[in-house]
Amino acid sequence: MNKLYDLQLFAGEANTQTTGHGGLSAEMKTYYGMELLENAKPQLVHNQFAATKPLPAGGGKTVEWRKFGSFDKALTPLTEGVTPDGSGISVSYITKELAQYGDYTTVSDMLDLTAIDDVVLEITDRHGSNMGLTLDTVTRNEIQQGSQVIYAPVQGEGGSQTDVLHRYDLTDKCKLTSELVAKAATQLKKMNAPTFEGKYVCIIHPSVAFDLRQDPAWVAAHQYAAATELFSGEIGELHGVRFVETTEAKIFRGQDLARNSRTLTVNGKVENAAVVGFDGGTVAANALKGRYVLVGGKRYKVVGNTASQLTLDTAVTAADNDVIYPGEGGSQGCAVYGCLFLGKGAYGVVDLSEGTEVIVKPRGSSGTADPLDQRSSVGWKGIHAAAILYDEYMVRVECGSSYSGEDKAN
């Protein structure tokens, strides 16, 4: 029976060699490499809308994108026989440092790598998915930092709305609506953001898609699939925006504040002070340092803590037993969703096909580091970078959903 060993069990010389695929045929290398990429592709939702850039020639550690400016309108009539002054083109550059990512699995000597093995194939499949998720998350976290943000208003009774100005004020009543979709699309149009064959794209979480599908104007993807090539994960269209669904769409939500409790409570009345006593949970010293908390509906940064006191960056006034919530998400610590509305060319990534590889080290390839030929390994590594190129070509709509009380940060 084959056994799967812990990742770090054999950490040492055997896992730091750089010789690649020793002992594997060229056909097997190609096969496993193709398998890795095929399993990575479905996870690369955020990467599929990026402007791709080849890895720098000569193995440089930074990648560079050029941004070209626009020309002013040429409104001056031409004079017969006179050549006018031409217009120069402004070019700016955006650079990003490349980073390498990777993972591997060590397996027992029961694995025979002289032919394509089901165990190796299964591990390669899993690592392909892991690679896709990893590199897609790197891209997602970069492009979630855009400056164009719309906060979903609170939807009240009878169609009333209350504006929201901060992420930490969003609730499960702040859903993504048809009106918000139209507003985001209009903002992109006003910035002359290029489209993807006449449509903008939005990447959303299934929890948000659940709410949006209730809109009568929603058009499911199967209704136009015959005439349009669908994006990976595409589920439908609304107001000229094609929606792509993924569980990797960004969720903002703070972790529990205590080892045994999500929230804490204020211990004793606080009058305009930065030090707040608390109880209601077990917290290690400085475990909350650098995090955000909500006290009385306002957000504060924790600069330090003991097992019974928080030191905040700003003085606070609070009543005894007021609840202290995690402050990285919405109101009362609920989940907030970052829905990315994108125009073409808004951001760039490096070409993944050039910088990724699967590495299979057969049993017996580690020399004296594995004297009994007991171990083999399967892994991947990849070089990646992502950058926002045109901030005005993307809008992030932050909203709640019917699942804001249960979804976790990702």
For each of these PLM feature ranges, what is it?
Residues S70, M110, A315-T317:
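Residue-level signature for short turns and capping positions that connect secondary-structure elements
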